[in-house]
Amino acid sequence: MPSYRWDNAPVGHFLPSLLTTSGAHGGTDSAGACMLNVFRLSNGRLFQEEIETSVIEQTQVQPVWVDLEAPTREEKEWISARFGVVIPENIVDDDLEESARFYEEDNGELHIRSDFLIEDGETSRNVRVAFILHSGILFSVHAEDLPVFRLLRLRARRIPALIEDAKDVLLKLYDADAEYSADTLEGIYDSLEKVSHRVLKQDVDDRAAGEALTAIAREEDLNGRIRRNVMDTRRALSFMMRSRMLNAEQFEEARQIMRDIDSLDSHTAFLFDKINFLMDATVGFININQNKIIKIFSVASVALLPPTLIASIYGMNFKSMPELDQPWGYPFALCLMVASVAAPFIYFRRKGWLR
């Protein structure tokens, strides 16, 4: 399978629209008609078209996939009237119960809600996508365009016989999602290697350690999102396999994707261990630097104790202190104080406590 850059994957093959086109994700024209992104199969390839709802009844387009990116109310209402499927108002929910996110209606309509990863440099996030499989057509609803969707559109256009029906579209999306997660994990490993080279060198100051901690925390967050993403994909595939909606070839493909996800699980666990090691090492270097500062103050305070004692002794107001009456008494006290400071420093230096 040829590899493609995720960030440069084209949005898709846009055939000439039947009427005035709008944005890439659909919209409405001045007359109020909606533009939809529909995908049809032609000679074993998947092609994307922007079709106006006002004339779709007169076209011969038989979509296999209808992709709704940030759909308007008019688009949802038209989809419901034209295809008899209800598009959910809110696709983002926090219910982790499988029965709430993966279920089948009495009429055979399948509903699946999955998370897909977006990693664009400094930030990463999971985007919820609602899938509805109705009458041989896959409907997908999401708030923004996804790298996984772009990759599938690119591959399905270039590779013949990659997709045969709507269920293949859904499986290929999950397959591309697993591959995208694997590529992102490789990027995390490369980033951690760079951090490791910086942290494990001989001298690490507090500034470098702080930058390393920031980078490690960012990679830990991304690794956690990937772990959650592949877990969600596994649950969706498991539901599809249990629902007996797949033929033998599709079932085997789903099992292969599950095996790929299992390998990603072990890799994320390895990266978590590496992140914890680098985190502990970085915090350890920060503690060492702080201990060096504390050691300097400790040595200085110990070295200044003897001259303080000498000054205290000669500051006592006793009559019988012969040195006070001698002309050399004051220089003698100063020299004694300097010697009492120098002697501990020389001793500490020989012991290696000043390093």
Residue ranges and their predicted role:
Residues 2, 7-10, 14-16, 20, ...:
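Hydrophobic alpha-helical transmembrane segments and their immediately adjacent juxtamembrane loops
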Residues 2-242, 246-248, 256, 260-263, ...:
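Peripheral, non-transmembrane regulatory/ligand-interaction domains of membrane transport proteins
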Residues 59-60, 168, 210, 217, ...:
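General secondary-structure edge motif
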Residues 148, 253, 327-331:
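Short acidic-hydrophobic sequence patches enriched in Asp/Glu that either
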Residues 236-251, 278-289:
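Long amphipathic alpha-helical coiled-coil segments
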